[in-house]
Swiss-Prot record:
It is found in: Cytoplasm. The gene is fusA2. NCBIfam families: EF-G, PRK12740.1-5, small_GTP. This is Elongation factor G 2. PROSITE patterns: G_TR_1, G_TR_2. GTP binds at residues 15-22, 82-86, 136-139. Gene3D superfamilies: 3.30.230.10, 3.30.70.240, Elongation Factor G (Translational Gtpase), domain 3, P-loop containing nucleotide triphosphate hydrolases, Translation factors. Its main location: cytoplasm. Residues 6-282 form the tr-type G domain. One of its GO terms (cellular component) is cytoplasm. Catalyzes the GTP-dependent ribosomal translocation step during translation elongation. During this step, the ribosome changes from the pre-translocational (PRE) to the post-translocational (POST) state as the newly formed A-site-bound peptidyl-tRNA and P-site-bound deacylated tRNA move to the P and E sites, respectively. Catalyzes the coordinated movement of the two tRNA molecules, the mRNA and conformational changes in the ribosome. Keywords: Cytoplasm, Elongation factor, GTP-binding, Nucleotide-binding, Protein biosynthesis. It comes from Anaeromyxobacter dehalogenans (strain 2CP-C). InterPro entries: EFG_II, EFG_III, EFG_III/V, EFG_IV, EFG_V-like, EFTu-like_2, G_TR_CS, P-loop_NTPase.
Length: 694
């Protein structure tokens, strides 16, 4: 268990596909003596990279599932967390990024800043993750790390500063000039483990002096002490490092390193950069919501003696049951300790606590604040917060957005049917924005989520991880129904069946409101006896699940009851529930009901020369443009678009921009469906219903 938190780093490694992320991780593990032989992603030895533990990953040479590992470098403990590959819709992304304190953004020296680099960087910016850039593949034909540094400024709006210059490029790449030490470093030996320090080559001294001056200019913006030292010509390595670190942690500076992971060059210098410039857990602000004070935010302290607060950020089906990855934000965890799940309020005993190394694990007795570990034997969901029971804090707000899109899926055979149940159970535990259930009328399995891509990812995972193949129906939009004006109702439910009958009368009105549903009891004089008021409310609430237009849930509706009647013998809970249902039907039909559709906030980003084409694709889809901007050749267009118009949009956008633009989409609000479209939807629904009756 760590007590010197300055010696701890929690970092992520993110990149566009094929930028060399897994190869870089493999080298980091080798140089930190975590592994004792290097295996390539698509190596001839057939072993495959350490971090690619799934068979499918090793066959294809890509990383599918995320992995976590840890290693030591120069007395520091590094936890390396793989950031998720799909960064669009799931809550899991937010959790994974919350777990990181800093990150390495890997860029290809030839291709530079690519579309996925933009996406990854945007996510990190959203969660305030300080980062270093590593320009990889300097040995490749066409390598130009200086151009990539410029792209960081132009395309990502970073303030990049070179920490190194390359010694040679392409097949002549030998090493780097360290602009802080003003020394040359070359890497030799079978695996680049022999580092030779020497003077800067004569033909590079002028370039190195110029680049160091730029480094000092950029760093001095964050340190008056460094500014004074520059003027007095007494600059030290420590002053430069302290200033660059300050700028990096403030997200105002991006130190740029370079090398070739595949050719084993300069990875050790990047590790030095992680130590020097990325934050330890005490330098990052983490907050929790106090459940005793209406989810008020409270700051957490990296302190092993404080009450324990930990977040389950990833679940895996391990060989010994569910494996839960945890980040400890405050306090400590130990084996056999009892912890409380803040969502379920249940206590659990930690049966086994481990450190992960890809798919291998090492048992430990305890872990402290700021650390990342995994536990077995605790039943939980991804995103659950655990405490030691002395505090009621939650790491994430309890609010989970409602799904906006649904698909019906059907397994192709009995084997797929068995596996589908297992897959859906696991996915709904991992991701609260993903829902699955049975449609009572059709008997079909319906999955719901935050967008097309969100559901596509899970259908693909079913196939890959559970060998479950399903047929997918066209997507369905999660419409809602509401009323648009006030309407009165006065309904009497009367039933005589011999013996005691049923009687209940309910009067009042229905009207639009801001809340999902509001029930107001304005009955005076005992017209409806008090003991039946809750039955009346229950009757009204039972009608909310299915509206009377197309059977979608009803929202933004207030029901006020102000009169009624009862019978001494025939009135009962059941009678008043039925009276309320009849009153609802009467009032709802008179209150001009209408359909609401989900409106998505869509952000499109691509080269400025395609901005006209991007606008065109949006305007064809009933979009309302909110704003557009052009940042250094990168156009960003923000719009609100009905979800019903967004199906297949990725293909349209790709063809309109030669595949150079991308978009993200999130739910914004519900708005009324235009009258003509609502009419069309209802006509389709009635035809479908008639077809079903035949």
């Amino acid at each position: 268990m760590y007590t010197d938190f300055s010696k701890l780093r929690n970092i992520g490694i993110s990149a566009h596909i094929d930028s060399g992320k897994t190869t870089l991780t493999e080298r980091i593990l080798f140089y930190t003596k975590r592994i004792h032989a290097i295996h390539e992603v698509k190596g001839k030895d057939g072993v495959g990279a350490t971090m690619d533990s799934m068979e499918l990953e090793r066959e294809r040479g890509i990383t599918i599932a995320s992995a976590a590992t840890h290693c030591e470098w120069k007395g520091l403990h590094l936890n390396i967390i793989d950031t998720p590959g799909h960064v669009d819709f799931t809550i899991e992304v937010e959790r994974s990024l919350r777990v990181l304190d800093g990150a390495i953004l890997v860029l290809c020296s030839v291709a530079g800043v690519q579309s996925q680099s933009l996406t990854v960087d945007r996510q990190m910016r959203r969660y305030n993750v300080p980062r270093l850039a590593f320009v990889n593949k300097c040995d490749r034909s066409g390598a130009n790390p200086i151009r990539v540094k410029d792209q960081l400024r132009e395309k990502l709006q970073h303030n990049p500063v070179l920490m190194q210059l390359p010694i040679g490029l392409e097949d002549k790449f030998e090493g780097v000039v360290d602009l802080v030490k003003m020394k040359a470093f070359r890497f030799s030996g079978d695996d680049g483990e022999v580092i030779t320090e020497s003077e800067i080559p004569a033909d590079m001294q002028a370039d190195a002096a110029r680049a160091r001056e730029e480094l000092l200019d950029a760093a001095s913006m964050f340190s008056d002490e460094l500014t004074d030292a520059i003027l007095e010509d007494r600059v030290t390595e420590e002053l430069i490092k302290a200033a660059v670190r300050k700028g990096t942690l403030a997200l105002k500076l991006t130190p740029v390193f370079m090398g070739s992971a595949y050719k084993n060059k300069a990875v050790q210098k990047l590790l030095d950069g992680v130590v020097d410039y990325l934050p330890d857990p005490t330098e990052v602000v983490n907050e929790a919501h106090d459940l005793t004070k209406d989810e008020e935010k409270v700051a957490l302290t990296i302190d092993n003696e404080k009450p324990t607060v930990a977040l389950a950020f990833k679940l895996e089906d391990g060989r010994y049951g569910q494996l839960t990855y945890l980040r400890i934000y405050q306090g400590k965890l130990s084996r056999d300790m009892f912890i409380t799940n803040m969502r379920t309020k249940k206590d659990h005993r930690i049966g086994r606590l481990v450190r992960m190394h890809s798919d291998q694990m090492e048992d430990i007795d305890a872990a402290g604040s700021g650390d990342i570990v995994a536990m077995f034997g605790v039943d939980c969901n991804s995103g659950d917060t655990f405490t030691d029971g002395t505090v009621k804090l939650n790491m994430t707000s309890m609010h989970v957005p409602e799904p906006v899109i649904a698909l019906s899926i059907k397994p192709v055979d009995s084997k797929s049917e068995t596996n589908m149940g297992k897959a859906l159970r696991r996915f709904t535990r991992e991701d609260p924005t993903f829902r699955a259930g049975l449609d009572e009328e059709s008997g079909e399995t319906i999955i719901r989520g935050m967008g097309e891509l969100h559901l596509e990812v899970y259908i693909e995972r079913m196939k890959r991880e559970y060998n479950c193949i399903v047929e997918v129906s066209p997507p369905q939009v999660a419409y809602r129904e509401t009323v648009s004006q006030r309407a009165d109702f006065a309904y009497t439910h009367k039933k005589q069946t011999g013996g005691s009958g049923q009687f209940g009368r309910v009067c009042g009105y229905i009207e639009p409101c801001e809340q999902q549903f509001e029930f107001v009891d304005d009955v005076v004089g005992g017209a409806i006896p008090r003991e039946f008021i809750s039955a009346v409310e229950k009757g009204f609430r039972s009608m909310l699940a299915k509206g009377r237009l197309l059977g979608f849930p009803v929202v933004n509706t207030r029901v006020v009851i102000n009169d009624g009647a009862s019978h001494a013998v025939d009135s009962s809970d059941i009678a008043f529930q039925e009276a309320a249902r009849g009153a609802w039907r009467e009032g709802f039909d008179r209150a001009k009901p209408r359909l609401l559709e989900p409106i998505m906030r869509v952000v499109c980003e691509g080269p400025a020369e395609f901005s006209g084409g991007i606008l065109g694709t949006l305007m064809q889809r009933r979009a309302m443009i909110i704003g557009s901007q052009d940042d250094g050749g990168l156009a960003r267009i923000e719009a609100e678009v009905p979800l019903a118009e967004m199906f297949g949009y990725s293909t349209t956008l790709r063809s309109a921009t030669q595949g150079k633009a991308e978009f993200s989409m999130e739910f914004s609000r519900y708005l009324p469906v235009p009258a003509a479209m609502a009419e069309e939807l209802m006509t389709k629904a009635s035809k479908k219903a008639e077809g079903g009756k035949k």
